[in-house]
Regions:
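Membrane-embedded beta-strand positions of outer-membrane beta-barrel proteins
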Residues: 32-34, 73-75, 102, 116, ...
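Outer-membrane beta-barrel "beta-signal"
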Residues: 37, 113, 155-165, 185-197
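Residues that define the transmembrane beta-barrel architecture of outer-membrane proteins
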Residues: 26-28, 49-55, 94-98, 148-152, ...
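Cleavable N-terminal export/targeting peptides
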Residues: 1-26
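Outer-membrane beta-barrel strand-turn architecture
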Residues: 24, 63-67, 106-110, 160-162, ...
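Outer-membrane beta-barrel translocator domains and adjoining extracellular loop/strand segments
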Residues: 42-48, 83-90, 127-134, 178-183
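Transmembrane beta-strands of outer-membrane beta-barrel pores
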Residues: 36-40, 77-81, 120-124, 170-174, ...
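Repeated loop/turn-to-beta-strand initiation elements of outer-membrane beta-barrel proteins
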Residues: 68-71, 111-114, 162-168
Length: 197
């Protein structure tokens, strides 16, 4: 008898879960997001430069494939780069990108999510500034970045029922910023707030 009750309860739970997933399968959100960047560059996968403080802003589309799983595509303008200090002087390179992250999101709880996914970035501008006392390397050399950057994002955050989200993300760059200069790669922390429209 108990076994029959357990089977019945299990079937009801399965049906309820399936219905809940179907209700959320076609759910989608579109919104705006922006926030604060802490950007640096890693050389040879070890030594990391000082951080550049900057920002990012963009749009996103989030589509649920089940109650707890969603895909999110973003189009983002991101100010990145790095700082190097030596002998009282500072060298700063400002690198501006248009980034396109594609994120696999999981919601283990209703308002909490984890995310991971690839990102492609396109360098659109760069600018170098330095003090006259800076002499760690030759500042007259060319600092033209590669047009294409790519890597992986990891992150998490909270999203309320009314569509406001707070998130933290780490971008692990896997493509070299320059050619033949010690494998410099982007390392960026992003702290963002988003709003569904």
């Amino acid at each position: 008898m108990k076994k029959g009750y357990l089977i019945t309860i299990a079937l009801l739970c399965l049906i309820f879960t399936s219905n809940a997933q179907e209700e959320n399968t076609n759910a989608s959100n579109f919104g705006l997001k922006g926030g604060y960047n802490l950007a640096a560059v890693s050389f040879d996968g070890e030594e990391e430069t000082g951080q550049r403080h900057s920002f990012h802003v963009g749009i996103y589309g989030e589509s649920f494939v089940s109650k707890a799983v969603a895909l999110q595509l973003e189009l983002q303008y991101s100010q990145q780069g790095y700082q190097v200090k030596s002998n009282g002087g500072t060298f700063t390179q400002k690198l501006d990108y248009i980034n396109i992250p594609l994120l696999f999101k999981m919601y283990p709880e209703d308002s909490f999510y984890l995310e991971v996914g690839p990102q492609a970035g396109f360098a659109i501008s760069h600018k170098e500034t330095f003090d006259s006392s800076f002499n760690l390397f030759d500042t007259s050399q060319e600092f033209e970045p590669n047009k294409l950057d790519w890597g992986i994002n990891f992150g998490g955050g909270f999203k309320t029922n009314n569509g406001v989200s707070l998130g933290v993300r780490y971008h692990l760059g896997l493509g070299d910023i320059y050619e033949d200069q010690g494998s410099p790669r982007n390392r960026v922390w992003q702290f963002s707030i988003g709003f569904d429209l």
